[in-house]
Amino acid sequence: MMIKIASITKVENGSIVTPKGFSAIGTAIGLKKEKKDLGAIVCDVPASCAAVYTTNQIQAAPLQVTKDSITTERKLQAIIVNSGNANACTGMKGLQDAYEMRVLGAEHFGVKENYVAVASTGVIGVPLPMDIIRKGIATLIPAKEENEAHSFSEAILTTDLITKETCYEMSIDGKKVMIAGVAKGSGMIHPNMATMLSFITTDAHIEHDVLQTALSQITNHTFNQITVDGDTSTNDMVIAMASGLSETKPINMEHADWETFVFALQKVCEDLAKKIAQDGEGATKLIEVNVLGAQTNEEAKKIAKQIVGSSLVKTAIHGEDPNWGRIISSIGQSEVAINPNTIEITLQSIAVLKNSEPQTFSEEEMKERLQEDEIVINVYLHLGEETGSAWGCDLSYEYVKINACYRT
């Protein structure tokens, strides 16, 4: 089945409140100095939901509470997020605090307790100041205005320099359906689902099981293919909510527009993943690695992520040095079976290696292209038909400075 790309359009200035039924709010309650630090997304109706969580064995209290909510009801109506404190490694008291946040949210928004998800991001190992949290939740008044959605996107940030939002419109059953997303993430990014949070809203009519299948698959190709510093976080999660208020027929794998929905969801996740990679702590450049001609998609993704995660590749890109030897070395370290004699590498569309032979190129032209904000590395294996991509950023002096002083 061909994906109806023509029926998918990016919505400029769209946000998580663009899909029908959603409102949002972000505000400052004092968890961070002079910055927004508490937010909420609320749906007019119980929404079908799906989620993907960190694979870090240490999982923060809010993540455990959210898992409990989604497993119990398979629907959500509100998400409460705080930044500035991760509520991770805070013992039984931390878990009690996360459950209290869920109760407070349910009471404040007038929804069932198990319809509330909780997320936190920030410093690990510090108890939540619940007196501030309690007062803060009581002040949340979500609205359907775009500016409140943007306020939410600010409230979930930690060391991020920019907010991360995206929105698409698609046609399902001949009706307009919207899907949007917001994310935070800058450091500790090396997901298998890093610190990374993402929230997706849509007015598509889709049930939990189907949405979960789609989100899990797409996460593997998008969020799990970004890396900033090779660390995974205790708090990462991606949550999707579907209000169903577009009033289409239920979307499932047999639906004529199934691939249209999947493609739109993938575009949202890919946009957010790239924005996270580009906003890596201290980053000055986005790095995209595409591996083509692999035997399997998994092998292509593994090689791409190996390259983009290499500190030597990252520092070379930061220094605008076309040291492709670091790229070929990373390929060899990936533990994927390759044929060194068939590999081709291009850097910013300039061939640097072909059939194990170094290629002559203009140093001046290469230097100019490496000054660009987005760097693309293409690797051609010539072993099969599969492809895979990964995204990351350069490694700068500023990264060390930011993380050396994070708590202070």
From Swiss-Prot:
- Keyword Zinc-finger included in the entry's annotation: no
Which GO molecular-function terms appear in the entry?
Answer: glutamate N-acetyltransferase activity; L-glutamate N-acetyltransferase activity
Q: Does the keyword DNA-binding apply?
A: no
Which residues are named in the active-site annotation? 195
Q: Which domain of life is it from?
A: Bacteria
State a single Pfam family of this protein.
ArgJ
Report the catalytic activity: N(2)-acetyl-L-ornithine + L-glutamate = N-acetyl-L-glutamate + L-ornithine; L-glutamate + acetyl-CoA = N-acetyl-L-glutamate + CoA + H(+)
User: Where is the site labelled Cleavage?
Assistant: 194-195
Name the pathway it acts in.
Amino-acid biosynthesis; L-arginine biosynthesis; L-ornithine and N-acetyl-L-glutamate from L-glutamate and N(2)-acetyl-L-ornithine (cyclic): step 1/1; Amino-acid biosynthesis; L-arginine biosynthesis; N(2)-acetyl-L-ornithine from L-glutamate: step 1/4
**Which GO BP terms sit in this record?**
L-arginine biosynthetic process; ornithine biosynthetic process
Class of this enzyme: transferase
Q: Where does substrate bind?
A: 158, 184, 195, 281, 403, 408
Q: How does it assemble?
A: Heterotetramer of two alpha and two beta chains.
Task: Report the function annotation for this chain.
Answer: Catalyzes two activities which are involved in the cyclic version of arginine biosynthesis: the synthesis of N-acetylglutamate from glutamate and acetyl-CoA as the acetyl donor, and of ornithine by transacetylation between N(2)-acetylornithine and glutamate.
UniProt lists the family membership as follows:
Belongs to the ArgJ family.
* UniProt protein name: Arginine biosynthesis bifunctional protein ArgJ
Species assigned in the record: Bacillus thuringiensis subsp. konkukian (strain 97-27)
Which lineage? Bacteria, Bacillati, Bacillota, Bacilli, Bacillales
